[in-house]
Amino acid sequence: MELNIAENRNHLNYSKWMYVKRILWTFGYRNTILRLFGAKIGKHVHIYSSTVIWFPWNLEIGDWSAIGEETLIYNLGKVTIGEKATVSHRVHVCAGTHDYTDPALPLLRPEIRIGNQTWICANTFIGPDIEIGEGAVIGAGTVMVKDAEPWGVYAGNPAKYIKKRILKK
């Protein structure tokens, strides 16, 4: 039996809601809505529909970057993501915390900066007041509680420097 690819592609494989969701939340449409709420989003940016962004006015993303599915950007403080950066699915970017030295636990809003050409792999946690240097790779499931140097590869809980990232020519 041969597979009929054309028939399969024309068949409705998803619920009507899934098709409506895909139309309503295309990258361009979602980016436009985020911009209307104050986000600064570059050209050719892909932000998946299941991404949660708490405060669009505290978000800046450079050209050609992508934010994966089910990513949580808790941006009480400003979150800046550089150009050609990839934030994979289910990443938690947490630009909010509390001052645990104060009995009242006041809310703090430190910034997070993610550099150009970085790759934040799936299920990673980026803590408050962290800078991910240009070209760095943060391995899947990593917990970042300290800055990452440019062009470094990091992994683990807590994150540890693994090696230098060297691009092939």
Language-model features: where?
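Terminal amphipathic alpha-helical/low-complexity segments used for targeting or macromolecular assembly
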Residues: M1-H44, K84, Q117, G135, ...
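A short acidic, helix-capping loop that chelates divalent metal ions and anchors anionic groups
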Residues: Y100-P103
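Left-handed beta-helix
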Residues: K43, Y48-S49, W54-F55, G62-D63, ...
